Amino acid sequence: MKTIKYLTLFLVTFLVITGLNAQFSKNPLESYSLVKISINSNEDIIRLQMNDITVEHYRGNLKSGIELVINQAEISRLANTGLSYEIKIKDLDSYYQNRSKASQTEMQKSINILNQDNISGFSYGSMGGYFTYDEMIQKLDSMRIMYPNLISVKQNLGFSNEGREIWAVRISDNPGINESETEAPIYFDALHHAREPQAMACLMYYMYWLLDNYGTDPEATYLVNNRQIYFVPIANPDGYEYNNFTNPEGGGMWRKNRKNNGTCFGVDLNRNYNYGWGVNSGSSNDPCSETYRGLSAGSEPETQAIKTFVQTIHPKISFSMHSVAGRYLNPYGYNDTAVNYDIYSEFSSDFAASNNYYYGTVIEMLSYYSSGTTRDYLHSTGTYSWTPEVGGSDFWPLQSEIIPVANENLYGLKYLSWVGGAYTDYVNYNIAGNGFVNANDTLNLQITLKNKGLSMTSKNVTAEVTSLYSNATPLNSSVNFDSIQARQFKNNSGNFLKFKLSSAAAYMDEMKFVVSVKQEGVETSRDTIRINVGKPIVIFSDNGLNGISKWTRAGTGLLWDTTFIDPFYGSKNFADSRFGNSKNSSNNTFTLSDTINLINTNNPRIEFSAKWAEETNFDYTRIQVSTNFGSTWTSLPGRHTTLISGTPSYTSIKRWVSEQINLNSYIGQKIRIRFNLVTDNGVPGDGFYFNNFKVVNYKDEGTSVVLTNLNVPAEYKLYQNYPNPFNPVTHLEFGIPVMQGESELVSLKVYDLLGKEIAVLVNEKLSPGNYIYEFDGSKIPSGTYIYKLESGNFSAVRKMILLK
């Protein structure tokens, strides 16, 4: 009897173990290696995808080769592609078990970041530093206990294939109440792919930042009070738990859910959504493939749970977090179309500048297709959605990387939470009145703001300007903008910010001012603006409103044009790629058609605003001049250029900045100006945008036109210069009568006897009266010159003689 009982117990135990082994035992499809592949073109990546080799989240590029994590079956198929490859790490299981631990110095860096972000609740989990599924649940419960008024009780969205709950929480000031009518709903999820735990770590880090900083940090407090922020930390609990079973210390390479397909396990949940399902090479119909899309669109319970949830909350904007490429992917993934690029480019250029992740469609960023993704589905429902591929050394970054990578993605998560509702940002400035300021003058500053938010009106908007220039005293340093509607501009016309310059303000001094923008008392923007003391005489200007009529395009790739993407108020941008990212292997130019005359200038400058996103040190834009009508070109340094091979260039990612370039080396010459964009065959960035392009000459008002008296002449007068002949200074006098307007556009220019323009002395509106201009001829040769006065229909000329 006992023998039968023990035998029965043995058989039951054997069957249980056998069942577990069937559930969790590994096979060649689950033995992973790190492989480096030499590729020559983007088409090679598509070739890999067509051979059902998982190319997602590769590291590297066409220049150095790409590294993939693939299983043994994929390695066998790789041999059929004809591409050269090298197995870098044959057994990733062994690699993760034996890799070195973080040093004390590395861990101290993480502690410093936590202190900097004022986060106390975030900690490490037991799976290589990452939370397990159960630990994540415990964290959500402890958050609720610690902050019951800020985070909801966890909500079960549905059950996975194996019956595990898919949990969601809401962070808001009334977490138990749906306030989406007055508070914009924002949505974040992670771990659709079970081997990407850093994505979850980034979300949990942000959750703790919101909770731990509430009540002490104005930004965190505002976002919690004015948003409904939803989090799904683990969208694929079965796959993640499977990795915990096979690799409890981290390093599990299982990607899909655990659907039993008969021959193989798993559906790629990020290929199972309805929109674009099964299109192109962006997924596989092979149940054993890492990108198997399932039997039908939305077939998986995990996918169904997420879909039902987002259809309920109607988020304005979202991130579906992945790893490990260091990119922001916007729709669509299943084809070459970049939809709503105005929004995606504008927002991406703002938040990507914080961590230098490039952004664009999947085919632009990674050279392959992905169909049936969360991102594309969310966009199809009216939610602006990105797939952030967060950085790190691999799918399971070292424990010492967890907090630094979470920190480098914190700004993007905050930014998305802002722009889902109201978000006021500084745009640009103008000097009101005559457009310049000198010593003893009052600077009248007009600034333009924009509510970049997708919904909600910005309320109680204020701007405060602080002078960092000791010779500028504030008279009115703050202004109330009241409210700004979503996606609208507003300026402080009629209520200028005012600063009085003292007599110590010197010609060409650079004045710096800090602009702080707040809405409802919370700072949303802080920028530094720079203004030179002196009068900028405009030699050339173009705000893009009249297209590219003043420019010439040439070269390979896309051709420069104007674009409506992310414009300043009252202008259009010029861009190398007007509706999407730049093209690889481009070398093109955008050349100003006019020749710029710098004869008789004393402080000429190029001024414009710009933003750019270009692969660091490989792709770049240069602004160049030629003094020989385009035979040779010289690249110019500016405030924001960096050196590539010793040459000044714009590269990497930068949001809107004001650029100024000194042309003093070219005084007395005529020059051509152009922009030159060059890309290689790597990652094509959003390219280069610029606007409000000007060439100006700053002149000292001590040698400029001066109103001598208010005895208004009855008609225009142009008097003979005195002395004449002269060396090197003479005085030119003229009179302006009363016309229909209060002021008239007046032009006073100097020519040689061949009619060649030598100098523009006056080109501005002047009130009626008598004027004198002190002309300095020290930079031109002896000879006879003509000076010409024009205003309206009036024109007069006289001669003067320079004898040296």
Feature roles, as predicted:
Residues 424-439, 536-547, 696-721, 737-742:
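Residue-level detector of functionally pivotal "anchor" positions at catalytic/ligand-binding pockets or at interdomain
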Residues 539-588, 635-657:
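Extracellular glycan-recognition surfaces and repeat-rich motifs
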Residues 1, 487, 623, 673, ...:
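Terminal processing/anchoring signals of secreted or surface-associated proteins
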Residues 618, 679-698:
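Extracellular carbohydrate recognition
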Residues 473-505:
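Intrinsically disordered, low-complexity Pro/Gly/Ser/Thr-rich segments with frequent PxxP/GP/PP motifs
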Residues 598-607, 612, 704-722, 726-750, ...:
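Glycine-centered coil/turn sites that cap beta-strands in beta-rich domains
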Residues 762-797:
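Short, surface-exposed loop/turn motifs with a glycine/proline- and acidic-biased composition
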Residues 227, 244-432, 474:
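Metallocarboxypeptidase
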